[in-house]
Amino acid sequence: MKGGQAKTSLSVNLAARIAKARRDVLLIDSDVQANVTTIFQRDHVCNLANLILGRVQKFEFIELDRHFYFLPSGETEIVEATQSLAQSRQRETFLRKLLEPISQGIVIVDTAPSWSDLSRNLLMYVDYVIVPVVTDYLGYSGCDQIMNYISQFQRQSLGQCQAEVLGIAITRYNTRTNLSQTIRKGLQEQWPELMFSNLIEETVSIQEAPAFHQNIFDYRSGRTRGAYMYDALCKEIMKRIAQREKERRSHGQVA
């Protein structure tokens, strides 16, 4: 969950792609930086912080588009909410019980670039984790730290944490540097079964879309190289989720 790995870009564009496939999706911003909230310029009294703090009792999501719903973080108030989780009796399962009534088909959470009681709560809530990586040295080392942390947390939870790493996505790849190629090769060698084959190269459209408060598929009507790359990656992600769900059902697990 290291910063600078294009987590927000992946979260926003994956959610948008799912919605365009006519499937209900809820995007939750859980980051104090509130990057998703900034992109869409939408806030609401019903946000993640106020839900955790008990200031609102009813779920009311912002409808960004047909099938596309959004729950803001509450920006700086999420810090207070995270502190309240540390004092809760249900310290690591509070959020899972709080969000259980959500009926939207797929929930995607944009996480903060740090480990906290909130991030541990989110690991207890989600079914899958996608690790975004930028192909530089810090991105590579950060990926290793995340994988180790998730594995450690799963052991400490004594089976309560059912989240599994769905895959590792290269979200910012510089085709002009040898370092990017070396890092990509290293990732493939270390986690061959987890790497998504489709990657996101650095493009102007991906950088510009948030400035126009749009996802990559709405920016310039989706006729950009960035949109084509994200479309391929999102399709691969959804295909892998379908495979994992099938495996879970065959083993009698409830997703």
What are these regions (language model features)?
Residues 1-255:
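P-loop NTP-binding core
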